[in-house]
């Protein structure tokens, strides 16, 4: 018979030809030697003359080794054959990564990589270091895959299967930080006709660029895309004769199917279409049962899918993102002279279904969707009834739900058997679904979920007719059930004795939902217990609300009674944190059996930082702060923080570093645990404890250092605005230093969004004079002893009025602070900083203006020295901003990198905008110096003046102000 005659043949003739193909399949199956496997039901592909359209195939797996019937995922074979009728090309996509330009200067020295991702495969370039805002790559990445195309585009143009690729940039030190990602379909660069793809040289280059985001928002990634067709062989399933050859080179017949109506192949075929199986399924089972009944329990089927060693890709319609599926290929040429150019397409079903045991959750979704969609029509039409001779068959249904070794006769099945099989499928699905329910669900959630499943699965149709005759969906029925339970809880409000009868409510529920007798028998006791538990919990909630309302009424309170409660604010990053007046915020302990603070060997202290400062951090990394011994600066250094820094800058970088490390040193604890620091620190057991005694470890303060670490943390987190003794000033100001230190870290790492107003020169003085003034600084204990001696020599009347201490009424305390990460063996995070605290002596009576927290924390007898009170006027933080990427006397290169890494990893690289400095210092601007990168002294001051009444408006105030940068004298001299 010629090709034209076959195309004009009727549907009956087509069915006969299809049966002959199936006979060849069955013969090949019987002659295959190998271990027995579960029976696989396969519907052979029905090919169409259309290039891009095929019909659906269904597969069912019945496995005796499985503990429960798990429905088979029908999407996988559909995705595997979705390319039938299309042309396949082996394409090699090339990605040329040129460079990244326009990177911010703060990323200089950072190593970046460009990653090219296709599903589970990720290709990465070699790391490239950023130099002056540019990262050079000049590297090519290659990805080879199969591309299927058809002539279904406009004007018979080529239409390719989508190939989505993800391109993104990330730092090597922080691979989780993405600096911009872009999705792109590389089939857009393929030609518009399939003939060009088959040409001798099929290639095209596309140059483009992508904008980055995040920290590299202003940067541009320059790329080039290219492709090349690896081979010229094209697999066109519609242009070649298709044959099925059995193993052993037994001659077979070559047939061509007549044209059928085109059906669009999508990733997710509707359940109703998937049930319309091919007629060959029933015939294949019948032949298997007649010719080889002893092997009906399992027959090995070795089939494969024609393709090469590459992956066949398909779109995931659920998320719009493609999923990855590897397919094995097998292509055999026929030895029959009558089939010269014929090819065989083999489907390896075991390879496709090798992960069936791992995809239980995906499979159950199919049966759920299938059942609901089929219920909308007629229950009797759920199972396929195809026949070659006009007789209805349901062998497919029996294979799904039965694990017996017998092959039932299709003619013996009637509608009642189909209905029983359908109910058995749903019952098996329910058992599998309930067995997969997480045991971690609480009773309420489990009760609601079980009631919902029972409703959906025990009804025989998706519509329930109410007494009004109108159909309602299961969702509406579930809503009505919840309304009834809420109404039952409402009746409880009227009957406080709890004697309401809820069993009748369950009976009414069953009547309203028109449940059958079998529905009420399955799980009725369980539903009653869960519903009763749910109602009991609601009763307890209602009782609690009633008791609360009664107490409020007895105390003459209403809902607005607590709106104006007094509170104290302590800022985090951006928004205030309100704390009760009578209770401060407890700091986290530094370790097991250790309080929030410990002394170090050199007399300093390690303190736990307020964890609320890191509540906006992505990784919630908790830092600790190492604080040095405070010193009192001489008044000749200046009365303003900016003036003091100008004299510091006049001493030079090396002189300043050496003097600061000598006066207020910080012990190197890197690589040591907190317990090791505590063990090494051996102080005399006198004075006040630094750690909380209730924690079990007692570390005494060193002699000569007064209350740097407050034992009860009464000042650190409460921010008491009143007057305190001088030795408690550091504890009072520590929270402000916490906030300023985070901003200071950003300034050091060039990640602050605020630039300094300008740069000024240091004080015009000799370097030796500046160093001598710094050396005159006294420790806090020494200054207190000196001040007490001055008081003893003065008249008591003058002392009480404060007139005898004109030169000593204003002081500036300086201490060195350093952030450390306890999770990295106390590694320094950034460079150390100088905290400057300016205080003023209070002229009021000590007993009247003593801070309430100080009175509660210690007895006044323990103050000593007749307890002079002080109040904080200004808190500032200063540091050195040096050339990045180089070791420096102030900090090392690793400290700079660790600070940048921590800011990037925790997402704290953005800050609150600062207001301009209001300092009256004369600005001497040097344009040439400010244009170049110079070593400068930066500083910020807190806008909280710690005076009574200031905290009322603290929420609206800016937390800090950026001062002018002070440029070191030698740097300016060399560049002027």
Curated annotation (Swiss-Prot):
Residues 81-229 form the C2 NT-type domain. Residues 309-319 have a biased composition (Basic and acidic residues). Residues 394-414 have a biased composition (Low complexity). Residues 309-343, 381-419 are annotated as: Disordered. Transmembrane segments: none annotated. Seems not necessary for chloroplast and nuclear photorelocation movements. PANTHER family: PROTEIN PLASTID MOVEMENT IMPAIRED 1-RELATED 1, PROTEIN PLASTID MOVEMENT IMPAIRED 1-RELATED 2. This is Protein PLASTID MOVEMENT IMPAIRED 1-RELATED 2.
């Amino acid at each position: 018979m010629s090709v034209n005659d076959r195309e004009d043949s009727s549907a009956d003739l087509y069915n006969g030809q299809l049966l002959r193909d199936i006979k060849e399949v069955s013969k090949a199956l019987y002659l295959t030697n190998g271990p027995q496997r579960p029976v696989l039901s396969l519907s052979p592909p029905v090919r169409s003359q259309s290039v891009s359209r095929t019909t659906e195939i269904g597969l069912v797996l019945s496995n005796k080794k499985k503990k429960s019937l798990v429905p088979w995922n029908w999407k996988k074979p559909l995705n595997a054959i979705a390319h039938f009728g299309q042309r396949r090309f082996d394409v090699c996509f090339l990605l040329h990564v040129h460079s990244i330009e326009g990177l911010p200067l703060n990323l200089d020295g950072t190593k970046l990589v460009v990653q090219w991702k296709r599903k589970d495969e990720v290709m990465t370039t070699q790391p490239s270091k950023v130099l002056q805002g540019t990262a050079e790559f000049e590297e090519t990445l290659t990805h080879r895959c199969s591309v299927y195309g058809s002539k279904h585009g406009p004007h018979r143009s080529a239409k390719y299967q989508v190939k989505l690729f993800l391109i993104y940039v990330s730092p090597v030190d922080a691979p989780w930080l993405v600096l911009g990602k872009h999705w792109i379909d590389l089939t857009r660069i393929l030609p518009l006709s399939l003939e060009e793809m088959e040409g001798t040289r099929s290639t095209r280059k596309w140059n483009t660029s992508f904008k980055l985001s995040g920290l590299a928002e202003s940067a541009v990634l320059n790329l080039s895309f290219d492709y090349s067709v690896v081979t010229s062989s094209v697999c066109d399933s519609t242009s070649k004769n298709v044959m099925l050859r059995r193993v052993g080179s037994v001659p077979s017949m070559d047939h061509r199917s007549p044209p059928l109506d085109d059906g669009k192949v999508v990733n997710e075929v509707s359940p109703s279409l998937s049930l319309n199986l091919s007629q060959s399924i029933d015939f294949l089972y019948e032949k298997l049962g007649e010719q080889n009944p002893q092997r009906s329990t399992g027959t090995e089927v070795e089939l494969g899918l024609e393709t090469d060693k590459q992956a066949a890709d398909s779109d995931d319609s659920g998320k719009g993102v493609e999923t990855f599926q590897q397919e094995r290929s097998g292509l055999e040429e026929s030895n029959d002279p009558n089939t010269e150019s014929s090819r065989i397409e083999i489907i390896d079903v075991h390879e496709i279904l090798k992960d069936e045991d791992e995809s239980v959750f995906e499979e159950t979704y199919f049966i759920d969707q299938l059942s609901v969609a089929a219920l909308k029509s007629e229950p009797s039409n759920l199972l396929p009834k195809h026949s070659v001779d006009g007789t209805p068959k349901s062998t497919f249904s029996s294979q799904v739900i039965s694990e017996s070794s017998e092959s039932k006769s299709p003619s013996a099945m009637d509608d009642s058997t189909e209905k029983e099989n359908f109910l058995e499928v749903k019952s098996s699905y329910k058992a599998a679904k309930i067995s997969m329910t997480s045991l971690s669900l609480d009773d309420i959630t489990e009760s609601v979920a079980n009631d919902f499943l029972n409703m959906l699965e025990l009804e025989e149709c998706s519509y329930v007719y109410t007494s009004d005759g109108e159909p309602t969906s299961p969702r509406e029925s579930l809503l009505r059930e919840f309304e009834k339970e809420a109404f039952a809880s409402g009746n409880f409000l009227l009957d406080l004795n709890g004697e309401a009868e809820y069993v009748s409510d369950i009976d009414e529920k069953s009547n309203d939902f028109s449940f059958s007798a079998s529905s009420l028998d399955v799980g009725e006791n369980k539903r009653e217990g869960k519903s009763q538990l749910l109602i009991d919990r609601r009763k307890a909630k209602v009782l609690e609300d009633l008791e609360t309302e009664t107490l409020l009424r007895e105390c003459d309170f209403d809902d607005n009674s607590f709106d104006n409660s007094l509170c104290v604010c302590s800022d985090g990053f951006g928004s205030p944190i309100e704390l009760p007046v009578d209770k401060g915020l407890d700091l986290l302990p530094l370790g097991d059996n250790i309080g929030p603070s410990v002394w170090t060997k050199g007399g300093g202290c390690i303190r736990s930082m307020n964890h609320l400062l890191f509540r906006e951090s992505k990784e919630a990394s908790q830092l600790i702060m190492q604080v040095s011994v405070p010193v009192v600066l001489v008044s000749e250094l200046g009365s303003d923080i900016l003036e003091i820094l100008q004299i510091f800058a006049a001493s030079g970088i090396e002189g300043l570093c050496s003097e600061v490390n000598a006066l207020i040193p910080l012990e190197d604890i890197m690589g040591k645990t907190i317990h090791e620091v505590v063990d090494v620190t051996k102080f005399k057991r006198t004075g006040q404890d630094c750690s909380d005694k209730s924690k079990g470890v007692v570390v005494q303060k060193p002699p000569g250092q007064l209350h740097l670490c407050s034992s009860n943390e009464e000042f650190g987190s409460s921010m008491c605005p009143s007057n305190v003794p001088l030795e408690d000033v550091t504890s009072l100001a520590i929270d402000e230093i916490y906030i300023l230190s985070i901003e200071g870290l950003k300034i050091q790492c060039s990640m602050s969004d605020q630039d300094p107003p300008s740069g000024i020169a240091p004080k015009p003085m000799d370097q030796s004079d500046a160093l001598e003034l710094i050396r005159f600084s006294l420790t806090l204990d020494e200054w207190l002893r000196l001040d007490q001696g001055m008081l003893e020599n003065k008249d008591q009347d003058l002392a009480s009025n404060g007139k005898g201490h004109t030169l000593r009424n204003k002081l500036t305390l300086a201490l060195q602070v350093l952030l450390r990460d306890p999770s990295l063996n106390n590694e320094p995070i950034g460079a150390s900083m100088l905290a400057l605290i300016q205080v003023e002596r209070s002229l009021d009576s000590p007993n009247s203006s003593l801070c309430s927290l100080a009175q509660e924390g210690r007895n006044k007898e323990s103050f000593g020295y007749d307890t002079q009170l002080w109040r904080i006027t200004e808190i500032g933080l200063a540091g050195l901003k040096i050339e990045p990427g180089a070791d420096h006397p102030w900090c090392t290169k690793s400290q700079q990198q660790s600070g940048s890494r921590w800011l990037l990893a925790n997402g704290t690289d953005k800050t609150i905008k600062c207001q301009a400095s209001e300092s009256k210092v004369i600005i001497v601007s040097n344009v040439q110096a400010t244009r170049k990168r110079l070593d400068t002294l930066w500083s910020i001051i807190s806008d909280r003046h710690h005076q009574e009444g200031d905290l009322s408006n603290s929420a609206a105030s800016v937390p800090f102000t950026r001062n002018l940068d002070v440029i070191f004298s030698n740097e300016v001299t060399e560049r002027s």
